[in-house]
Amino acid sequence: ADAIASDPMRSMEYPTAEEIAKAFSQEGLVGNLYKNYEPRAEQRDMSTSVRDAFASGDNLVVEAGTGVGKSMAYLVPLALTAQRNDITVGVATKTNALLDQLVFKEVPALAKALRVSDPDAKPLTCAPLKGFSHYPCLRKIRSVVDDGAAMKEIQGKELSQAPAMAALLSFIEQTEYDDIDGLKLDYRLLPRKVITTSSQECLRRKCPFFGN
């Protein structure tokens, strides 16, 4: 990304149509990812169209049915373009479930295949970004901790917030991803709104935890 920013007129290098076709062959980049992989013309054609849209700067709308392999069809030209030009590329997904699939399954598999095919290439990495309500707000959590664990009545039973608070604090201390969806908290005990913030509530640079 810095390379493009410092020289905005620098020409970009894109994978060729032949490289895309080879990637989706049985012996290619994608073919080596899956056992008993069968090349699909629809997947290859979609990937080529994505590559062409990158190169021309045009918009592209694709409609493809289930089983085509849409994610890998756009990830391959995206990854090759990002690697060769040392840039960051964003992918917006409709659901968080699809985002998690890309982050934890598709991209790591593709990154491994790229390392095998070209050990000297820059490693492919990714970072997920979700909405405010998916990440712990340290300012709000400090307030919850300062107030101490309270008792909550859940289905006629008095339950303490302490175990949920302990799990949350341990999660924050030990993880880098920090997406609380993976923690599976009982939000009846510890409501999401008291441990996360919103775009309206976030203090940004004025927050005492800014940069943490």
Residue ranges and their predicted role:
Residues 38-39, 65-70, 200-207:
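Short, flexible loop segments at the rims of nucleotide/cofactor-binding pockets, characterized by
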Residues 59-61, 81, 212:
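A compositional/structural signature marking long, glycine- and acidic/polar-rich segments
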Residues 39-42, 46, 70-71, 99, ...:
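Phosphate/oxyanion-binding active-site loops and adjacent basic polyanion-contact surfaces
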Residues 51-52, 72-85, 105-109:
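Walker A/P-loop NTP-binding motif
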Residues 56-77:
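Walker A/P-loop
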Residues 2-33, 86-88, 92-212:
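A substrate-engagement module of RecA-like helicase motors
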